[in-house]
Amino acid sequence: MDARHQPWFLVFATFLLVSGLPAPEKFVKDIDGGIDQDIFDINQGLGLDLFEGDIKLEANGKNSIIGDHKRWPHTIPYVLEDSLEMNAKGVILNAFERYRLKTCIDFKPWSGEANYISVFKGSGCWSSVGNIHAGKQELSIGTNCDRIATVQHEFLHALGFWHEQSRADRDDYVIIVWDRIQPGKEHNFNIYNDSVSDSLNVPYDYTSVMHYSKTAFQNGTESTIVTRISEFEDVIGQRMDFSDYDLLKLNQLYNCTSSLSFMDSCDFELENICGMIQSSGDSADWQRVSQVLSGPESDHSKMGQCKDSGFFMHFNTSILNEGATAMLESRLLYPKRGFQCLEFYLYNSGSGNDQLNIYTREYTTGQQGGVLTLQRQIKEVPIGSWQLHYVTLQVTKKFRVVFEGLRGPGTSSGGLSIDDINLSETRCPHHIWHIQNFTQILGGQDTSVYSPPFYSSKGYAFQIYMDLRSSTNVGIYFHLISGANDDQLQWPCPWQQATMTLLDQNPDIRQRMFNQRSITTDPTMTSDNGSYFWDRPSKVGVTDVFPNGTQFSRGIGYGTTVFITRERLKSREFIKGDDIYILLTVEDISHLNSTSAVPDPVPTLAVHNACSEVVCQNGGICVVQDGRAECKCPAGEDWWYMGKRCEKRGSTRDTVIIAVSSTVTVFAVMLIITLVSVYCTRRKYRKKARANTAAMTLENQHAF
């Protein structure tokens, strides 16, 4: 049955927010057990003794510099092994989409390539660093590792990244408190010089997804890492998303000049309005402004916080007659994937009958003006705030996105405004949960917030529960609820992955750090009483009442009490204009449960590790350059090692002695040369003088 066929009470309740009704503790299941475990906590709890906590070293135990030979191709083959949990498989595929959106790195199912990444459920979360040319290169996403930022972290290792705090200039930015580190774990805080870990001339990054947290390997309750800038104390160790510097380094390392699935972003700060054009076939124009008397008072990008900046596009319907239109068209865009997601913010200060139409103008051979296709009509009641919208597109040819403002009937005191447009070749979220006046809700005591009811694409009704009762963390849970389609659906609910994303409202989608969590409905999972956890809500749930008085059944919630800390929630642009957005997607991932046919590997010769036969002395590190093993020798401020195997020691004192000796030697040689030259010259002139004297004597003799 179509998921949009909802009973009247759900339609009515869609716009309602239930708050102040705490869920019974026993009616939610916390997948984290109330503990926010980092990668290193998980691995240590399993008794793993990995290099730096989550790195699997090569067989010879050596660390080598990341050079061209350690890089992967831009499209990396992978296999999702059958051992992986279903939720982990879906999370990994979502992580790949983050790489595609922000880098030129792509991933494809393995089809026999010589080297590929095998992702499996091992013990803990770990990876090797770089392409080790082993054929099948393992990367473990074990129990509790199925968080998207954890997957991003481990794949960054596989792509060649070390941990941020191990770089050579680490001590300029953080202080390692050695006596707070667990005995025997001190080596996890080693520094590696530039010959091992290349910072690519990018500043130290407190916000890196590759940085240890302040509590890494602690032997008590106090921090093992103290940031020299105190404001970053609770920032290090974030596991939300790539930082800007993570992306800068990754794109430099792999020579990325553009992102794969990103298409366009526009906040209208520049006068060229991102290459957009005003159509000639309309009766009015969109205007670039910084405020409108009737609203909005500021743009959405900067919220009026920056003087002489903060612009948006406005269609003034108050001065136009009914039926007037204004069309704003994007620059030409060239799709590659066949599906796109358009995102923008809309502010209506005009009439409730004013309308925004979203078109695509697709160009084909022989059609100069393109084919105009209506994608969405948006008509909303003016509520005095910016509203987020998503529009799914499916364009396969060269196209433009067209924003058409239409003056409707009735009185208007303002018009339509748009801002912060993003277009990418990604999937749009299925639903948006918009929570207004959030700081007031967040400041309340014993507060819980329920979302409106939603439907998945398969027809399952669900609701999200946000737990705000903790003074330190915010929790989030997914509930199945009774809906119009329950008689036609399969129960227990099989393999639906619910992804809940707290939106970072940065104007540019590439610079956002999303906070996201996914859970999957396992039809075999049981509750403590033996009933199926994801069975029909009317069978295993409890009865509740919507604000309009209509009863419904709510199943057990599944999620986490440590979705995000309150401190992180107040960072970035999660809360903007006192609004937050939770993006919701529920998709069927049952196809990931089947075993894919695995091709036979391409026959290859075993890769010879040239460093296996080279022993570098005095702490030197073996590297492979152009297929040859070389020793990179350590050096200090006034000393260094040199030689084929770093067997010779040098120092500035030796250099001074050599320089002085060389100078004296050169001076002595030059002096000798000068003396010899003078001697030879004088001897030459003496001979010439004697010859002249003899000639004069002979002439005198002939005269007589």
UniProtKB/Swiss-Prot annotation:
Cofactor(s) needed for function = Zn(2+)
**Coiled coil location:** none
Query: Cofactor note, please?
Result: Binds 1 zinc ion per subunit.
- Per the UniProt topology annotation, the Cytoplasmic ranges are 679-704
What's the catalysed reaction? Hydrolysis of proteins, including azocasein, and peptides. Hydrolysis of 5-His-|-Leu-6, 6-Leu-|-Cys-7, 14-Ala-|-Leu-15 and 19-Cys-|-Gly-20 bonds in insulin B chain
Entry annotation: catalytic residues: E154
Source taxonomy: Eukaryota, Metazoa, Chordata, Craniata, Vertebrata
Expression is induced as follows:
By retinoic acid.
Outline the extent of the Peptidase M12A domain: 63-257
Q: In which tissues is it expressed?
A: Isoform 1 is expressed in kidney, intestinal brush borders, and salivary ducts. Isoform 2 has been found in carcinoma cells.
Entry's localization field: Cell membrane; Secreted
Q: Give the quaternary structure.
A: Homotetramer consisting of disulfide-linked beta subunits, or heterotetramer of two alpha and two beta subunits formed by non-covalent association of two disulfide-linked heterodimers. Interacts with MBL2 through its carbohydrate moiety. This interaction may inhibit its catalytic activity. Interacts with TSPAN8.
Which cellular component appears as one GO term in the record?
Answer: membrane
- Return the EC number: 3.4.24.63
How does the protein's chain sit in the membrane according to the entry?
Single-pass type I membrane protein
Return the SUPFAM superfamilies for the record: Concanavalin A-like lectins/glucanases (SSF49899), EGF/Laminin (SSF57196), Metalloproteases ('zincins'), catalytic domain (SSF55486), TRAF domain-like (SSF49599)
Protein's recorded name: Meprin A subunit beta
Propeptide residues, per UniProt?
A: 21-64
Domain MATH, by residue range, is 431-586
List Phosphothreonine occurrences by residue: T697
How far does the signal peptide extend, from start to end residue? 1-20
- Organism of origin is Mus musculus (Mouse)
Post-translational note:
Proteolytically activated by trypsin in the intestinal lumen and kallikrein-related peptidases in other tissues. N-glycosylated; contains high mannose and/or complex biantennary structures.
Instruction: Offer one example of a GO biological process linked to this entry.
Output: inflammatory response
- Which keywords belong to this entry? Cell membrane, Disulfide bond, EGF-like domain, Glycoprotein, Hydrolase, Inflammatory response, Membrane, Metal-binding, Metalloprotease, Phosphoprotein, Protease, Secreted, Signal, Transmembrane, Transmembrane helix, Zinc, Zymogen
Extract the GO molecular function terms from the UniProt entry: identical protein binding; metalloendopeptidase activity; zinc ion binding
Record site: Mediates preference for acidic residues at subsite P1':
R239
